[in-house]
Amino acid sequence: MVVLSAFPVNASPLLDTGDFADCRIVFVDANAPADDVNASSALQLPASSPAKAPANPGRSAPPSPGPRLATGVARNILSPKPKIWLGQFPQPATSRTGAGVEAPSRPAGPQPLLVVPGHRVVLAAASPLFRQQLATQADAIIRLRDRTSLPAAQQLLLAHVYGRPLDWPALTPTTLAQLLVLSADHALPALQQAAAARLLHLLAAKRPVGGPGPAVAAAAAGVNTPLQRPPCGPSPLEGGAGTALPAPPPAAAAPPAGAAAVVCTALQEVHSVYVEAIAAVVGLPTDVAGAGACVGLAAAARVLLLDALQDFEAAWQVPSLRRAFLGLPLPAALEVLASPALAVSCEGVVALAALAYEATRTQRAVEAAAAAAGEAGAADGGGGGGVGDGGGVLRPLDTCEQLALYGCVRWHLLHIDGRTHEWNSFLKNAVQRAPHLQRLLEHGTAASGTGGAVAAATGGVGLAPHAAAVPELAAAAAACGPYAAAASLLDLSQLTQSLLYTRQMRAEGGTGAAAHLPYMARRAGPRPRPTGHLQTAVHLQMDVPYVVLREAVARVQARMEQQERQRRLLERQQQQQQQHTKGGGGGGGVPAATAAALPLAVAPVAAVAVEEDLVGSELVFHAGYWWQMVVSLGPLCRYRMALAGPSAAAPPASGSAAVARNTPSALAAAAAAVAHDTDTRLVCFVGVRPLLLLTEAEVEAAAGRGVPSGWAGEGGCGGEGEGGEADGVAAVAAGAAVAARLLPSTVYVEQFEVWNERDLPQGRAALGPTAFARAGGFKGTLTLFALGAAALTSEAYWAKAVSGPEGALRVRARVAGVH
């Protein structure tokens, strides 16, 4: 590539040696505040003015033996050298400087990142911006929008200014994009055109043969995501070994086998040059992309981005494409998600991609803020100024940007597991944790059963999420691969393949829209479901060491004792209050203020959460739910919901007919649960439960123990009773009916095993499933240890249990075939 240099000759040796330097080139951060310079900045910016070239160069002082300035520490770099430079001499300084008058003071600005010697004649001839700067001050300032572009500015921008040819094939797309921004900011049109031409050449040369559709799908089939357990190659259904990919469209010639392998390998690389070039151009600032040589380049990159991400589900499995999408600017991400040509099997993929984008943006903003705070602390410790929050600093999405992002999802087309926008789906329960999305989620569902009822009762605003109510998120993050917990949404977004494929394409227009779909989406027949992922696991298993169980039992026992003390105190105070009322205000009662502050009734034992759950790290997806194993310790009365089920939560005293799906075994389990409301025997529950991401209020309502304020309002059921107050029985029944959609009515597993590593003094710890659990009709979905508080709280029992090598005895459970 032949590029006209800014200077007609190669003057780069002068830049390396500092010969005839008569000015300085200062690199600064454009995002730093203007008042970032204080008195200590004199260490970076020497106050000495540039000296004029002497009349007799032969009598000049010898050059300084010190190294070239590269860290901003001041040294005298302005003394001319006794050499003749290409038949020219440096321009003499102004008369004021020659007469001993100081040069014009530098304007207050950010601290320099780097200071190098410069030459006025070269800089002034290269750019009108440098010419204007050197006419009023002693330094040529290069402002960087991003500090990461400092190497490109120091090595490439100055090399072009001084006439050194650049090695264009060796430059990465990110470096070329940085050169585009630097050349646009410093009025170097030749460098800008050369960088734009190189990026266009990369996009044309690296584009997959025959279009990115087949190549992206083939690369996605060959990528082993972190969720594949155990790691395995692509199955025949995924287009792997044993199944040949269909031929590309007739319009494009079929590439050779070797070329196809190269394309797939390039897309599977961690850093793809083609994807990096697209992302670098799309990420250009608006003022740079909309002017000069970047106009056509930016338009081409946007078209290629939509082309590569058109088959969105296949592109999401390619690491380079997924990383490129998560790093896009918000306008580009909105253009991708809102594109009418985006082909997905269900709208849940788009919703989870939006969640992943917001999570990534928030995480990177937090990391950037932490880095800025660290730099500010280092600057304060060194006497310098702080780091400012300029326009280039990444920040989380505000409310308007979040609404724009999630507005790209067509919620009325949301299909999950064959159902349209129901509450008992994993995606709906996950997304509803964001309060600002409630109005968007209820769009188009005013008459869709539970969604419309809750929207009418709560005014479109959901219940406030409880931070400690969803401990399953930690297990979900741990099950999603070797990622940090803060990136759990990124990992959960990769699980979109578990949703049922309904072939609900976003493109509209019947047969005319088929031409806009990617080739892999236009194949005959439904898209095969991926295999090898976590949701296709045939079993769940969980190991809990006895040491962990012992600690959990101690914590639960302490909570139960504390709750019992509070309960006795409250009962005694209420008895005193009643005696005081009957005695006509005699002595011995409680004060009126204390009596008014006391609750009207003692809370039932089953309504107080004292249990502790140990959740397994593995998940299995089936029938719209994520299933997980859990070992829970607590009083028996706290497991009424698991024993009776939400369908039998309505009290039998209401006189209404039983629900049609209530079997005799379920009714018997409900009666047994009511009889055990005061049973505080400590038990160990081992079983399977759905991961619903519910709040505490929702779980309590599903258990029939309470109704959230938004679910049974003033005008709700039973409102025309005593003074407009809702009847308690009717409110509980209404809450249980609403919550019945959130929980499965009955759960079955094909195999359920719980065992120990050895026998214990009182027999095997796992003696269930007990007859009480059998009566619930759950057929092996749970086990209640037949060891009451006398055994679980016995020190001798645990001393024998943990007496193995390093206390490694465990309770092991395994289930298979969850229904």
Swiss-Prot record:
Which Gene3D superfamilies does the protein's record reference? Potassium Channel Kv1.1, Chain A (3.30.710.10)
Q: Where's it mainly located? A: cytoplasm
Domain of life the protein comes from: Eukaryota
Q: Where is this region: Disordered?
A: 46-72, 564-590
Task: Kindly give the InterPro entries that the UniProt entry links to this protein.
Answer: SKP1/BTB/POZ_sf
**Per UniProt, which keywords does this protein have?**
Coiled coil, Cytoplasm, Cytoskeleton
Residues annotated as coiled-coil are: 546-580
Compartments reported by the entry: Cytoplasm, Cytoskeleton, Microtubule organizing center, Centrosome, Centriole
Q: Which GO terms describe its cellular component?
A: centriole; cytoplasm
**Per the record, where are the segments of Low complexity compositional bias?**
46-59, 572-581
- The identity of this protein, by name, is Proteome of basal body protein 15
Organism expressing this protein natively: Chlamydomonas reinhardtii
Q: Which gene encodes it?
A: POB15
